[in-house]
């Protein structure tokens, strides 16, 4: 490659550029970009390590007045009929005491308790009846099972007796069986056709 004359001049330019960039970096370190001068002064005067707290004020510079609701002010309701049972005395839970006279309240309670006890008693009697019905069904099922077992045992015994009776008779009647077979083969009875698959 042929040497060019512009090389030394480029070195001079780059040196100037380097000096400018270093100057800019120094100034940027001291002053953050994008912040107004007034804000920069405040930041330099602020205590290190803590964020500044600003008081929230309205446009006029006055504090906001609190608005109270009707419930908080205890304003009485006008033209409202409140039943005695629903009226809630201050400091007490709603709906706990409806009757002023304790004797009448006890009378009401006894009536309600009697009704509930009657329901409970009826439930208990119903449960007892159902239990008796279940017991009767179970006994009946057991009786049926016993009868079936007895019938089964009787049949077994009957079959055993038949075998015992027929066993000695078979030994003496060999000639009779042979005659019966011959008579079948003579042509009176048709021989069954046997078909095998396989």
From Swiss-Prot:
Entry keyword annotation includes Coiled coil: yes
Coiled-coil annotated spans: 115-135
Comp. bias intervals (Basic residues): 54-66, 158-167, 181-198
GO biological-process terms attached to the record: intracellular mRNA localization; mRNA transport; ribosomal large subunit biogenesis
GO cellular component labels: nucleolus; preribosome, large subunit precursor
Low complexity compositional bias, start-end: 15-31
InterPro entries: Loc1 (IPR037650)
Job description of the protein: Required for efficient assembly and nuclear export of the 60S ribosomal subunit.
Name recorded for this polypeptide: 60S ribosomal subunit assembly/export protein LOC1
Organism listed in the record: Phaeosphaeria nodorum (strain SN15 / ATCC MYA-4574 / FGSC 10173)
Taxonomy of the source species: Eukaryota, Fungi, Dikarya, Ascomycota, Pezizomycotina
Gene: LOC1
């Amino acid at each position: 490659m042929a040497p060019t004359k512009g090389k030394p001049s480029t070195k001079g330019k780059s040196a100037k550029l380097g000096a400018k960039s270093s100057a800019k970096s120094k100034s940027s370190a001291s002053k953050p970009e994008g912040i107004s001068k007034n804000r920069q002064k405040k930041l330099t005067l602020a205590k290190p390590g803590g964020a500044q707290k600003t008081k929230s004020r309205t446009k006029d510079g006055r504090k906001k007045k609190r608005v109270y609701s009707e419930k908080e002010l205890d304003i009485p309701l006008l033209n409202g009929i409140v039943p005695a049972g629903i009226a809630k005395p201050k400091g007490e839970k709603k709906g706990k005491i409806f009757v002023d006279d304790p004797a009448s309240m006890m009378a009401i309670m006894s009536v309600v308790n009697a009704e509930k006890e009657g329901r409970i008693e009826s439930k208990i009697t119903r449960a007892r009846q159902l239990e008796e019905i279940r017991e009767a069904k179970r006994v009946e099922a057991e009786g049926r099972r016993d009868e079936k077992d007895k019938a089964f045992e009787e049949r077994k015994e009957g079959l055993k007796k038949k075998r015992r009776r027929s066993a000695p008779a078979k030994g003496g009647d060999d000639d009779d069986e042979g005659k019966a077979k011959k008579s079948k083969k003579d042509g009176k009875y048709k021989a069954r056709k046997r078909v095998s698959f396989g």
